Amino acid sequence: MSEPNAIVKVGNIIFSNEAPFSLIAGPCQIESRDHAFEMAGRIKTITDQVGIGFVYKSSYDKANRTSLSAVRGVGLENAMAIFSDLKKEFGCPILTDVHTEEQCTVVASTVDILQIPAFLCRQTDLLVAAAKTGRVINIKKGQFLAPWDMKNVLRKVTQSGNRNVMLCERGTSFGYNRLISDMRSLPILRSFGAPVIFDATHSVQEPGGQGDSSGGQRQFVEILARAAVSVGVAGIFLETHQDPDNAPSDGPNMIKIDHLQRLLETLMEFDYLSKKTIE
């Protein structure tokens, strides 16, 4: 098979399992233009201060909400305009999800990293369509998959002509409404040659845990993130918000943006020790 690139570059941001980790962060969904600008600006200021690469993430459509009445987002067209303006204002690359083959070309015209949601990670047509855009692809490992199953998922993208792929661990189903993080997954994913991302906030999600919405245990985000960077990863994925308890989606597992800088500074220390050992 075509081997994935061990180093993936997105603008001036580098994702490599042997380099200092970069951050993918933002609110779960685009709530409004003003909110997106507020969050991107605050995160960019923090990452500039601590000296870490930053990719802004947010979703335009939360297509797998627990309830039909749940807020899904601003939609594709509105999101592309917002993302374009965010890139001009802050100079940061953008990541967002795609759910259908038809969305891939539209999203790729503006967005730098196309993310394949965990529930869709085995959908061959979606993977091939995303790969053919030539954009960087971040594939979330399904909660239902063993880490070694992701090798076949990775092949679908690389054999479609795109070697710029990253694999993202976001927890494994463990009984009803629960996820666990098996840190052995990270070196297994790393052995396939692609940069590995750890999603520290969705890993503490409780899918459907509140009946008509998902719950979460944000008190464990820092613990799991520390463990992941200690093992060695290319990037950390975090959802953050100024008021998570009142966010329209995934509030229980998002961290308060007021806590982000201290968390990153802590993770950078663990990351340094981990990468020093790898060398």
Swiss-Prot record:
Pfam families assigned: DAHP_synth_1
Catalytic activity, EC: 2.5.1.55
Family annotation (InterPro entries): Aldolase_TIM, DAHP1/KDSA, KDO8P_synthase
GO cellular component, one term: cytoplasm
GO biological processes: keto-3-deoxy-D-manno-octulosonic acid biosynthetic process
Keyword Glycoprotein recorded: no
Protein name per its UniProtKB record: 2-dehydro-3-deoxyphosphooctonate aldolase
Gene name of this polypeptide: kdsA
